[in-house]
């Protein structure tokens, strides 16, 4: 478990914090997942708590409102932002809603034996099953969404298809299909924090800097300990690249250090 020990230890020796301190990488996760993401489960099963097919449907918060453009971009460019967006909603949860047209496109994690969801044959019935959510507001939002779908553009989940909504204050820019084919399913999600975007400021050689931008002798940082790498966005997998690049820099810098 990452509990920020590195940041605390750095601060104790005068390290400068840096970057988007209140930002984080957060993945939409099953609201009712096992504690700590199921650390006692095999790694192959833990990943099944992810729920990142929101782009094939819509997400509603407790007020029954949409709060992100689910089709803004490919999920690899949006999932970390949208996980944080879920955490910022009332109650720190949301519902991902789909109809039968996309059921075979949902990732295997949605069919995991421990996946939590509700199902109904009508949108009215589904909205009544959305625990913690205003059912009338939810139905109104879904009606407005359905009415706004652009039928002139074909649906293509393999590209930014431009199949959008029209006239909504918050659009869906791609992959907008009407929710009109039962059964309808809704999956409750929260945001699972992987790491924070804020961290310690480092030099080009990986040395941790103090508040005067002077290196702290013998102290180096790499990976998610380094602040200022990510801000409002996160391309999938780039955290691994960051760890590799900054890890190499820090290792080489430490090897050349007189301490």
Predicted regions: what they are:
Residues 65-94, 215-231, 235-237:
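Gly/Pro-rich active-site capping loops and adjacent beta-alpha segments
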Residues 36-79:
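Phosphate/diphosphate-binding loops
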Residues 1-33, 240, 246-249:
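Glycine-rich loop(s) and the adjacent beta-strand/alpha-helix scaffold that form part
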Residues 137-233:
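A glycine-rich dinucleotide-binding beta-alpha-beta segment and adjacent secondary-structure elements
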Residues 111-115, 233-238:
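Short glycine-enriched, charge-decorated loop/helix-capping segments at active-site entrances
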Residues 52-54, 194-196, 236:
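Short, small/polar residue-rich loop motifs at catalytic or cofactor-binding pockets
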Residues 96-156:
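N-terminal leader/propeptide and maturation segments of large enzyme subunits in energy/redox metabolism
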Residues 13-22, 66-68, 135-139:
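Acidic/polar loop patches that form or flank catalytic/metal-binding clefts of enzymes
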């Amino acid at each position: 478990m990452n509990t920020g020990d590195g940041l605390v230890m750095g601060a104790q020796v005068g390290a400068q914090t840096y970057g988007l301190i209140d930002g984080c990488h957060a993945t939409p996760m099953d609201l009712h997942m096992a504690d700590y993401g199921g650390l006692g489960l095999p790694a192959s099963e833990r990943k099944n708590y992810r729920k990142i097919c929101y782009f094939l449907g819509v997400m509603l918060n407790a007020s029954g409102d949409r709060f992100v453009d689910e089709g803004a971009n490919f999920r690899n460019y949006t999932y970390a932002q949208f996980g944080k967006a879920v955490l910022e909603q009332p109650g720190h949860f949301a519902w991902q809603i789909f109809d039968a047209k996309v059921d075979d496109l949902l990732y295997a994690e949605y069919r995991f034996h421990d996946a939590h969801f509700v199902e109904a044959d009508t949108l009215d019935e589904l909205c009544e099953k959305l625990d913690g959510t205003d059912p009338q507001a939810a139905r109104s939002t879904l009606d407005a969404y359905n009415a706004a779908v652009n039928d002139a553009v074909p649906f293509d989940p393999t590209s930014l298809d431009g199949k959008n909504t029209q006239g909504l204050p918050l659009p869906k820019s791609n992959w907008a299909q009407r929710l009109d084919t039962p059964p309808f399913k809704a999956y409750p999600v929260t945001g699972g924090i992987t790491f924070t975007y804020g961290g310690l400021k480092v030099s080009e050689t990986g040395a941790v800097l103090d508040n005067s931008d002077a290196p702290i002798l013998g102290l180096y940082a790499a990976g998610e300990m380094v602040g200022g790498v990510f801000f409002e966005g996160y391309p999938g997998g780039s955290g691994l690249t960051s760890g590799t690049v900054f890890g190499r820099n820090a290792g080489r810098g430490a090897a050349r250090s007189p301490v």
